[in-house]
């Protein structure tokens, strides 16, 4: 008799995706982040659900409802900090996953890659609206500053901002709709993740060499399930260490002050995972220019497959491209640091140079160096 997992309509889908899936035999731990992102998503949905049971999306009670969760709800503080730090772990995994895709040429699976970029944008939107919910000072002013950027859009900008706000300033209507968005978006992310997997399983996984591995596949279970469980344990350990020892390490102290429209914080800045984009936004003195640069800093990922000039898919055997890749990582870390600094000398010029380098590396240097490496292959 055939095993039920191979015949049952629903079990068959799961079997083909997680058990009998043919997987390259040589993929490294960098391929672990896909499943870790799935774990993060499940964790965020569950902790978020329990938080939503006690949270009230109203300007007069939002801040105190979060305090109530932390003080009066059983393990409320734990759920709240798991959710807040879980978002940070989510972005760490997300950036590692994208970095892996860039390094090993996974972007050549264009459908999978484009859905991935869409997923990144959706996760960023979810994190942004979620940060507004505790209704602290940074929540309020972050929402005001970032939504106000839309007013830079010619002709319809101001109308658009007031439409998103639901009034003439960030207020009760804004908070209510942001809570609604924050609740619905994770389910959209789940659906997109399923499509992401669907497209991936059409082509099969890439591997570190970038060479087709159809002749050397092994079943996903047990070989990679066991490796994924190890990765998951590391992730959970890191998350628990962060949550139980230094829960506020990545947060902003200003968010422990209730939102006050009459007092602006000295330095308005988003969470750490948005700082690189925020630095690019601030490095351009023009409002519309800054908004376009901000958008392009993320959307540039869509153009990566079109900028592929190398004959080799992976960077594994391309030392010059590797050097540029790690320069890009260093540049992004520099931008992240600059995004958290005040707008004054020398941070302004460093941010501008780092922003120029970011686009120059991706659009000019990497494709050019790939062409040079192609020439070197003929020597």
Curated annotation (Swiss-Prot):
Positions annotated to bind a ubiquinone: 201
**Matching Pfam families:** Cytochrom_B_C, Cytochrome_B
This protein's species is: Lissodelphis borealis
Q: What does this protein do?
A: Component of the ubiquinol-cytochrome c reductase complex (complex III or cytochrome b-c1 complex) that is part of the mitochondrial respiratory chain. The b-c1 complex mediates electron transfer from ubiquinol to cytochrome c. Contributes to the generation of a proton gradient across the mitochondrial membrane that is then used for ATP synthesis.
Q: What is the lineage of its organism?
A: Eukaryota, Metazoa, Chordata, Craniata, Vertebrata
State the free-text cofactor note: Binds 2 heme b groups non-covalently.
Q: How does it sit in the membrane?
A: Multi-pass membrane protein
Q: What is this protein called?
A: Cytochrome b
The cofactor(s) it depends on are: heme b
């Amino acid at each position: 008799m055939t095993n039920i997992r191979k015949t049952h309509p629903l079990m068959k889908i799961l079997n083909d995706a997680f058990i009998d899936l043919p997987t390259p035999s040589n993929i490294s731990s960098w391929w672990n982040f896909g499943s870790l992102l799935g774990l993060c998503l499940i964790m965020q949905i569950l902790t978020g659900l329990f938080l939503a049971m006690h949270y009230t999306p109203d300007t007069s009670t939002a801040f105190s409802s979060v305090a109530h969760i932390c003080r009066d709800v059983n393990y409320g503080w734990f759920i709240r900090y798991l959710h807040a730090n879980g978002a940070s772990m989510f972005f760490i995994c997300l950036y590692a996953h994208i970095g892996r895709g860039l390094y090993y040429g996974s972007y050549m699976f264009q459908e999978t890659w484009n859905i991935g970029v869409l997923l990144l944008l959706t996760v960023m939107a979810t994190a942004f609206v979620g940060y507004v919910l505790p209704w602290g000072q940074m929540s309020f002013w972050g929402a005001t500053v970032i939504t106000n950027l839309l007013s830079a859009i010619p002709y319809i900008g101001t109308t658009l901002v007031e439409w998103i706000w639901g009034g003439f300033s960030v207020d009760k209507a804004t908070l209510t709709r942001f809570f609604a968005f924050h609740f619905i978006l994770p389910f959209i992310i789940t659906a997109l993740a399923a499509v992401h997997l669907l497209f991936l399983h059409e082509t099969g996984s890439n591997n570190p060499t970038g060479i087709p591995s159809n002749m050397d596949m092994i079943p996903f279970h047990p070989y990679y399930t066991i490796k994924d469980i190890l990765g998951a344990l590391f992730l959970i350990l890191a998350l628990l260490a962060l949550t139980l020892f230094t829960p506020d390490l990545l947060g902003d102290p200003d968010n422990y002050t209730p939102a006050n429209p009459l007092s602006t914080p000295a330095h308005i800045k988003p969470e750490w995972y948005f700082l690189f984009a925020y630095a690019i936004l601030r490095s351009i003195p023009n409002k519309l220019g800054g908004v376009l640069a901000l958008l392009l800093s993320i959307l540039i990922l869509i153009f990566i497959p079109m900028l592929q000039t190398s004959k080799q898919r992976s960077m594994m055997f391309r030392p010059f491209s590797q050097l540029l890749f790690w320069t890009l990582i260093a540049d992004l870390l520099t931008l992240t640091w600059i995004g958290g600094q005040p707008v004054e000398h020398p941070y302004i010029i460093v941010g501008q140079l780092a922003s120029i380098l970011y686009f120059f590396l991706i659009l000019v240097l990497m494709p050019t160096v790939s062409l040079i490496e192609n020439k070197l292959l003929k020597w």
